[in-house]
Amino acid sequence: MNFLQTLNISATNKGVSTGVQWVKSKGEKLSSYSPVDGVLIGTVLGADKEAYEVVITKAQEAFADWRLWPAPKRGEIVRLVGMELRKFKTELGTLVSYEMGKSLQEGMGEVQEMIDICDFAVGLSRQLHGSTMHSERPGHRMYDQYHPLGIVGIISAFNFPVAVWAWNSMLAWVCGDVTVWKPSEKTPLCAVACQQIIQTVFKKNNVPEGVCGLISGGRDVGEWMSADKRIPLVSATGSTRMGKAVGAVVGERLGRSLLELGGNNSIIISSEADINIAITAAVFGAVGTAGQRCTTTRRLIIHEKIYNKFKERLVNAYSPLKIGNPLNEKMHVGPLIDKDAVTNYLNAVEKCKEEGGNFIVEPGVLKGKAFESGCYVKPCVAEAKNSYEIVQHETFAPILYIMKYKTIDEAIAMQNGVPQGLSSSIITNNLREAEQFLSHAGSDCGIANVNIGTSGAEIGGAFGGEKETGGGRESGSDAWKVYMRRQTNTINYTDKLPLAQGIRFDL
């Protein structure tokens, strides 16, 4: 496969790097099998503790130098990274699709997200601003400013094997931080490919060795990072269970954690909805990336007046979906990441049936020619209740639950009535409904949309959610502040020393 050669991916690959050179290691060997066809793409040698220490030590040394570079100069490096990513967009996007299983256009879109966040970060490098405040004391000035934090540990998930790392890294770098990346063991080759691209830019521009570390491996690497006091911030994307474990360990040492965890996202379909928009938003939201996005639409809350009509339209919309090799751009749905994910899908289907769910679009595992990997499943739709245990749980698969509501208050209560709080949406032409949904009494999610679906976030906005989603924010807006330490400054430019609150202390 030519795209692998272009990305310098071979049958066996080193998986530990300081950002400038590869590090010898004797850790776990990670084998990457494509869910597309079941073929072994390549292996990656993970980190042992010695290799881990090499990367962390280099990161510490690099931070001492990198933080002194002017922020716009750091931004220039990120700009060059973005230019290099543009050169390899097709090849890297193809690898994302082949190793993870998402459609080719989604793979290309993920690399475009990387490029977009580079562009955003370049502008940000000239806007890392604080605030100036008036002091109550005469002849004094107050302001706050932001300083680089240190090493940022990034633990990423398989479903977005490169974009989420870029969200964190590009912002961290312009903020003056250095990064250490532990990619998902299910998609290690995407990380190796990114590192190859980054190394080229960093070597040409004399970026300190250690600014961009890679530490491939299994759970033990994530545990080392979480417990490491030399890493002041750990950004972790994954399941709620994983996030709770990371958050507890990081919190025990009073470090910072940025957690991007599960979602159980819903679309409210109003009686005044544009049905065409609603159908497209619902179907793409539910089946895109084979239901493996954090923002995948998992629930439709449909007004009772249009429930039967909408249900019929929804079933008809599912009928022409093409399932198959995601490198074929005619396909709508690719495979799940692995056979464990297929097992989870089947278990969720059975659980839904046991609780009383009625499947109006039938589930199943596809077999035969072109489905040899065993990872292809049918997107399905079930009538269910919000109270079902399985509905309260996030299943990373294309399973969509639909249910009725009578009033907007009831719909919002159903939307909020799950442990997770990532993304939400309402499809309506009623201004009052839309504004209520967006108000303090509306959606309790970190993302709340009107007349678009729950997935497909742009990098300009902060991305993240509440409750068991973790509370972290990545990407745009002012998410950069989590990567820096805040400092308040008071300057006295007189020959006197008045105290605040009118206190006197005479000597």
Where are each of the predicted segments found?
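Hydrophobic face of amphipathic alpha-helices that form TPR/SEL1-like repeat modules
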Residues: M1-D37, G364
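A structural signal for short, well-ordered beta-strand elements
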Residues: S31, L45, R67-L68, M100, ...
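Residues at or immediately preceding the N-termini of alpha-helices
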Residues: P35, K49-Y52, A71, K89, ...
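Conserved C-terminal structural/oligomerization subdomain of aldehyde/semialdehyde dehydrogenase
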Residues: D37-T43, N206-V207, I231, I268, ...
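Residue-level signal for inorganic ion chemistry
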Residues: G38, R74, V96, C118, ...
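Glycine-rich loop-to-alpha-helix module at the N-terminal edge of alpha/beta enzyme cores
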Residues: V39-L128, G139
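Rossmann-like NAD(P) dinucleotide-binding subdomain of oxidoreductase/dehydrogenase enzymes
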Residues: G130-I277, Y405
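ALDH superfamily catalytic-core signature
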Residues: T200, R241-N386, A413, V450, ...
